[in-house]
Structures are given as structure tokens and as C-alpha cells.
Amino acid sequence: MGRTLENKQKIVTEIKSLLDDSEMAVVLDYKGLTIKEMSDLRSRLQTTNGICKVTKNSLMRKAIDGDSNWNDLESLLTGTNAFVLIKEDVGGAVKAIQSFQKDTKKSETKGALFEGRLLSDSEIKEIASLPSKEVLMAKIAGALNGVATKIAISINEVPSGLARSLKQHSEKSES
């Protein structure tokens, strides 16, 4: 039984909502993947706040129509597509996709769209090599903490140095 117009409109609305919440979209050719393998991909993406959505290209076209952030996605809408919509941990989700592809050797990445720009395969791989947001924040916090510690030591050193100088001067005066 075919989908009704109302059903299709609900799907388009759902896709629009998912796209509004997403930072990046990766388009995969899922031809040849089993249901078990698709479930495996979805479970790998859950930890990174990514969603794998299989939908007709025509419905995705309607969802991105008029949205300048996602318009370039249209060039990837041919064949059998699974759309991985990534909300937060972009690097982690891309790593999960690449790990899945390495394990199954069945799906290919057709392309990705990040901040309104199509990415090449090499750019997608670069994103996967980036540390997670938490790791970057920890590095920044560590660097800031190091600077604060150095400032505190420097500020504390001035009175200590002055006190040592005065003590040495008073000891010389007494002798």
C-alpha cells in the first residue's frame, strides 16, 4: 500500500525538524546492507547523537527545498540513500560511520554537507581525525588553568623576593 499525501507530509515535516537540529548530514549508499547491519549502524550512531534515516529522495528534496543550509544536498540525492543527521559530536559520528564501513565493506559515503558546504572525502576523513568536543574543552581548560597558575606564582613571587631582599639587607646592617 502506498503512502498517503498526509503521511508523506508528516515525513517531510519530521525530516525538516531533524535537519533544523542537525549540524551535519552524511549521505550513504546503503545498497546491499541487511536490516541487522542498518541496526548496527544506528546503534553506533546513538552514542554520538546521530540519526540514520532512510527516506525517499523525493521526500528529502521537499524537506530541503528553500533551506539555504541544505540546498547543496540535492546533488547527492540519487540512488539508494541513507541520511545520517548529526546533532553534536560530528567527529565521533563520522568515526562511527567509518568504523561501520570498514567492518561491513558494503556501504559508501556519497558525500556530506556541513555548514551549508559539500565536503570531499578527504575533508570528511579530516573531521573524523579531530578530537571530540570534550577533549578540546579539557585541553583549553588545562591551558587556561596553567596560565592562571603562572600568574598566581608570579604575583606571589614579588612580595617574597622583596621580603628576602629586606631580610638580607637587615642581616648585613646588623653585622
Curated annotation (Swiss-Prot):
It comes from the Bacteria. It holds the Pfam family Ribosomal_L10. GO terms for molecular function: large ribosomal subunit rRNA binding. InterPro entries: Ribosomal_uL10, Ribosomal_uL10-like_sf, Ribosomal_uL10_bac, Ribosomal_uL10_bac_type. Keywords: Ribonucleoprotein, Ribosomal protein, RNA-binding, rRNA-binding. NCBIfam families: PRK00099.1-1. HAMAP family: Ribosomal_uL10. Forms part of the ribosomal stalk, playing a central role in the interaction of the ribosome with GTP-bound translation factors. This is Large ribosomal subunit protein uL10. The gene is rplJ.
